[in-house]
Each structure stands twice: as structure tokens, then as C-alpha cells.
Amino acid sequence: MSTNPNAGIQPLTNSISQSASAHPELYHTTSHESVSTYQLQSQLSHSATSNLSTAANFHTRPPIANDENAQNLSTVNSSHSSELSKANLVDVEKCIQDPLLQIFPTVEDPDRFVFSIDPKSPLIAVNWPFRKKLKITCVYSYVALCSTFASSVFSVPAEAITTIFHISLTVSLLTMTVFLCGYIAGPIVWAPLSELSGRKLPLLIGMFGFGIFNISVAVAKDIQTIMMCRFFSGFFASAPLTVVAAAFADMYSNKHRGTAITIFAALVFDGPLVSPIIGGFLTKSYLGWRWTEYITSFMGFFALVIVYLFCDETYSKAIIRNKAKEYRAMSGNYFVHAKSEEEVLTVPDVAKNYLLVPMKLLFTEPIVFLITLYSSFVYAILYLLLEAYPIIFSEKRHFSMGVAELPYIGLLVGVFIGSAINISFEPWYYRRCLALGGKPDPEARLPPMMIGCFMFPAGIFWLSWSGYYSYVHWIVPTLSGLATGCGILLIFLQCLNYLIDAYLFRAASAVAANTIMRSAMAAGFPLFAVQMFHNMGVGWAGSLLGFIAVALIPMPFAFFFFGRKIREKSKMAVVL
């Protein structure tokens, strides 16, 4: 009795025919080709050469058995007319002559079975319609705003809990410090997770944990619980700060990426300035200080919902992995896989890439150290001002809680002015890059910073001495925020851009070093702010900070004129 060697694959071809009929957009066929086929690029030791068309794709490989009948089975490159590269066609029914191969398929070089997507495919985030990009940009910007909103929302209730829990003011200010310490620890987890699973999952996990731990703070019965939950709230809140900028880089080309990142940075700085205003009025009202955390948790859960419902994955490697998984399940061929699925990230890799290498860059590269020092200083001053403003407007001018925080609006407006200035420079920077053949020009990032380096100390001196004299009208120190906020935004943002362009292939490590130092300084500055402004006086305490800012003015000019020469002598910087 004879047997049909192709009988074993007939159900599979029938299944693919049904899938192709149900999902024609996933398959590419011509008028004379059957849809019950795979589009494969394959070569067998046997002489099987008939044509069929397919679209199949898959990911992990099962254990491979040795079989001499299939040692020359080679690559599968699935293809779709808009998604996949074209491949030669081979008759699937003649690919498997031995029934054992249906159970234990053998391949000589499984690494050649790589699934890929055309870079111009509409699946890739950079090719999405502008309306879709704008929607995701708004959602992710809101998520980042939630994160930084929580960092300082407890600055006003900190004074109230000193009486409730019988602690000193310095201890109560630790609630902001431990939150910012969570910013230091979080990126060590979220950055590698975003590389492995994409941008969306870290945001979902982050906002869920963020909401849970903010509720925990709201219902806490002792200061120890508040401190612990504030740390973990900061840990989960660091997810959007780690991931959102990368998601914008996924979606936008060089021409528009700078504008998107500027908007993101503005909202990151606006969060700590808006929350004390809301926190002040909530604490003063019948709702009490606990509602500052309830409101924050509700914001986090709302962010979780809208990210889940309205945001697609932007990371190209994750998109390819997901498509490979779909095609693998549809076709049953477990050889084909996405290249990124071969990557294995171990704990030593995480320690090296996100701790050791950043620290090495920080202490061996002058550019990284100086730029990080400057950006960390202005970032820390932002959180220090959260303690200085209540002294100026509440203690010296006797503004009530809530009203005393309204002068932060001056800083808010200043941040938006800085954003507008930065966006106005983007076309000029883009033309500079085009003149270099599309290569980044780090020094071209610095002109906005040259403006900010003067506005920043000017705003600090303005605030210090107009705030020192209580008879000066309150609008005068409030308007100082226009210069201070503008300077902070311009300096901080261009410092990050300069690091990314100067250390192109090590940009993640350079930014990680910047994140660690700036979060550490921001965590420490509020702890001595009150004592410094009380003991030295508002005028001289602010002047001390202003003199430090003046000493840093030459930095952007030095890097603008000599940055390329410094990079040429560096072992890690990029010179294109």
C-alpha cells in the first residue's frame, strides 16, 4: 500500500488558505498563484523547485534535531508587499519529504530564518500619519506630566504633616527627596525593559504602580509608610521619564524630533511648578493634605487607561517581534524569528550598560562631566526654588496657603518662553545637519543654551533681591520667574541634546549618567534650602546660587568653539 508523503501537510495548507482569505492584507499573491502557500526562501538537499507565494513569520526556535535529509534547509524571509522583503518561492509540499521533519524540523543555519519589515512600511512608527503621532504625543506628554507633578505635590503638605506626625520640617522634606531617589533607581529597570518589550509595557506597569503607591501614601498612618511609598511612587513614576523621549524618537524624523522633545521637556518642568499650586489649595481646603495624593493617583490611573486604549507600540524592534509572533502562530513554522528575539539581556549586561559605563563616562569624559554638572545644577535649582518661594511670599509677604504658590506661574510662563525660543532654532539646526550630509552637529545645539546661560543667573539675582525687601511689590519677584524658567529650559534641554549628538553610539549611557547625577542633586538641594535662606537671608542665599550660575556661563561658549577639538581627543565621543 502506497502512502502520500504530502498528506501530513495538507491540513496546514488548508489552514493558511483560510487565513489568507480572512486576512488578505497579510498575503501577497499574483493572479495565477494559489493562496494556499508560503512565501519562503528555502533550499533543500533534495531537488524541490516549484513556486508558491506566502506570508509567514515566526519567532523562537524549538529544539533542532539532526537529520541528514534537511541539512541544507536554509533561510526563510517572509515577505509582504508593504511589510516584508521579497523572497524566492518554493513549493511547500515538496519541502517536506520525510514525515519526521514535520515533528522534528532540522535546519543547518537557523539564524538565516530572520523576519523583517520594510522600513517604509506603515507599521513602523516613523511612517504613521501625523494625526496618529499627535494623538500619542499628547497622551505620552500627559503621562510625563503626571510623573513630575507627583514629585513636588507633597512640598506644601510637608509643612502640615510636621504637626500630624510630630517630625521636623527637614524630615518632612524628605518626602520629596525619597521620591527623587526613586528617579535614580527606576531607569535601571525601565530602560532595559523598554529595549526588550517596547515602550508601551513599561508605561503601563509604571502608571499602575504609580497609582497604587500614591493611594498608599494617602492612607498612610505613619511617616515610615509615607517615606517608603513615596520612594516606590518615584520609582514607578520614572518610567515615562525614561521611555517617552525614546518613543518620540521612534515616531519623528530629525526634522520634527527636536520640536517634540522640546514640548515633552516643557511639560516635564511644568509638572513640579503646577502641583504646589494645586497642593496648596487642596491642603488648605476641607479635603486636607491626603487628597493631594488621591488626586495624583487618579491622574496615574487615568494615564494607564488612555495609554492602553489609544497608544500603539512605537519601538520598531517590538513591532517586528509582535508581527513575527502573529505569523508564527498562523503558519506553525517556528524557525522564522525576529532578529531581536536572539538578544538576551542579563543582569551583568544591565549593570554594565546602565551603571558601570555611565559612571565611566561621567568621570573620564570632560564633556559628559561638565555638561552633566551644568544641567544637574539648573535642574536642582528648580526643586530648591520650591522651598525658597514659600519663604519669600508666605513668610515675608504673609500670603495664605495656595495663594503663596501662585507666583510659580511666572516660572511656568518662563518655561514656555524657553520652549518657543528653542523651537525657533530647530529649522536652523536642521539646515546645519543637512549641510553635513544629514549627520548631527553637536555644537549647533548650543546657541539657545548661550541665551539661557545669561537669563538663568539674571532671574536668580532678580528674585533674590526683589524678594528680600518685603515692601517691593509681589509682582516684581514673580516676574523674575520669566527669566529663570526660560534659562532653566534652554540650558537643560540643550545639555541633553549636546550629549546625545556628541556620544551618538553611547548616548544612552551618557543620558543615564546625566539622569543619575541630576536626580541626586535635585534630591539633596531642598534639604538645605530652608536653612540657607533663613540663615543667610533671601538676598545673599540667592546671590550665592547666582554667582555659581555666573561661573558656569563660559561653558556653552567653550564647547561651541572648542567642542569638536575636545571630541577628537576623546576615546568615546563621536566625530563625524
Curated annotation (Swiss-Prot):
It is found in: Endoplasmic reticulum; Golgi apparatus; Membrane. It comes from the Eukaryota. Its main location: endoplasmic reticulum. CDD domains: MFS_Tpo1_MDR_like. Pfam families: MFS_1. GO terms for biological process: spermidine transmembrane transport; spermine transmembrane transport; transmembrane transport. Keywords: Endoplasmic reticulum, Golgi apparatus, Membrane, Transmembrane, Transmembrane helix, Transport. Residues 1-21, 28-40 have a biased composition (Polar residues). SUPFAM superfamilies: MFS general substrate transporter (SSF103473). Disulfide bonds: none annotated. The keyword Transmembrane helix applies. Residues 1-40 are annotated as: Disordered. GO terms for molecular function: spermidine transmembrane transporter activity; spermine transmembrane transporter activity; transmembrane transporter activity. It is a multi-pass membrane protein. The chain crosses the membrane at residues 149-169, 173-193, 200-220, 231-251, 261-281, 291-311, 366-386, 401-421, 446-466, 472-492, 503-525, 542-562. Belongs to the major facilitator superfamily. CAR1 family. This is Uncharacterized transporter C569.05c. It comes from Schizosaccharomyces pombe (strain 972 / ATCC 24843).
